[in-house]
Amino acid sequence: PWYAVCGNHEYRGNTQAVVDYSTVSSRWRMPSRYYTKVIKENGTTLRLILVDTTPLIASYRADSAVYPDACHQDWQAQLDWVDRQLSTAKEDWVVVVGHHPIYAYTNKGENERMDMQATLGRILRKHKNVDMYVCGHIHNFQHIRKPGDTIDYVINSSPSLSRKKGKDIDGIKFCAG
């Protein structure tokens, strides 16, 4: 199955249709805009916490002409939900999945990542049980572990863009695209 999350391109259209597609496809799993899934296999447990990152970024909430649904989401309620999920997560692996990166080697402006660091990133670092944050948005592959951090930040997206010179960041382990 595909465990889906919305991204900025979905917010240009009918975001509820992305959620509702779960009723059409047996492979598409997205019961709501943010949700959790526990997978157990061979004695190992994995908790996926899938989040809707577009409403966490101020520029999307402010641009209601292009992203009409972003300003209607209660992003603080979502962050509170993530905090509660992480407070009780006891699985062997805890992986948080969203569309936008918290850290990235890119030439894109920093405002989105600064918003992500101040919102979701703050909560992830508060809890010592998060193993990995997986996202897309940048259109290449990256692995980052910030110095002193225990979370692996993985950007796993369609490598449709060649890597352009971006601002070097501490902790970049790998970048290809």
Language model segments and positions:
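Extended active-site neighborhood of metal-dependent phosphoesterases/phosphodiesterases
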Residues: 1-90, 109-132, 139-177
